[in-house]
């Protein structure tokens, strides 16, 4: 194989790594809300058995990362055992990553959206 051909193949492989890794890093934003306007609880894991980390004001737009299965909850958008991993920056500027029931997150879908959390 010639050096030029080898260099061309290597260039294509490196370029494809950048294309696919940038797609994997794309973050979606969704709105969390309750029917009553009460805050939404963010938990340390995907279920009501996990501790509440903080409460997010209803109507807030949050970065969404992935989903996991956990406790079944009934909320504004139905009944589901899907929990969404999201991010929230609290009043002190501390960034928190935790889980909110999908029944309080408007994703536009009744099923899982995006990637399953590891």
Curated annotation (Swiss-Prot):
InterPro entries: SH3-like_bac-type. Residues 1-26 form the signal peptide. SMART domains: SH3b. Keywords: Signal. It comes from the Bacteria. Residues 30-104 form the SH3b domain. To B.subtilis YraI. This is Uncharacterized protein YraJ. The gene is yraJ.
